[in-house]
Amino acid sequence: MRHKPTPPKGNKSLGNALASKKKVSKNQVVFFDYRDERKLKRFINDQGKIIPRRITGLSAKEQNLLTHSVKWARFLAVIPYVTDEYK
């Protein structure tokens, strides 16, 4: 007979975030274009920070591509560094 999985110890809110995370890519090629503002904003929180890999579900290579695309888009003023409410 199988037992119920126990929630992660420590931060309870983190356990909920990890349980509800979606894998963005599973055997798919993910391409992040620095000009695609809508796609990049999915991976940025309301403070303007890049969401970490453990929440987004991206692989290390994909997260690295995302980070470079977000930083390049910020540099070219495609997306803001921070939102207006945090200025």
Swiss-Prot record:
Region (Disordered): 1-21
Keyword tRNA-binding among record annotations: no
Signal peptide: none
Listed Pfam families: Ribosomal_S18
GO MF annotations, alphabetized: small ribosomal subunit rRNA binding; structural constituent of ribosome
Cross-referenced SUPFAM superfamilies: Ribosomal protein S18
Gene3D superfamilies: Ribosomal protein S18
One GO process term, biological-process aspect: translation
Disulphide bond pairs: none
Record keywords: Ribonucleoprotein, Ribosomal protein, RNA-binding, rRNA-binding
GO cellular component: cytosolic small ribosomal subunit
Known function: Binds as a heterodimer with protein bS6 to the central domain of the 16S rRNA, where it helps stabilize the platform of the 30S subunit.
Stated family: Belongs to the bacterial ribosomal protein bS18 family.
Subunit note: Part of the 30S ribosomal subunit. Forms a tight heterodimer with protein bS6.
HAMAP family: Ribosomal_bS18 (MF_00270)
Designated name of the protein: Small ribosomal subunit protein bS18
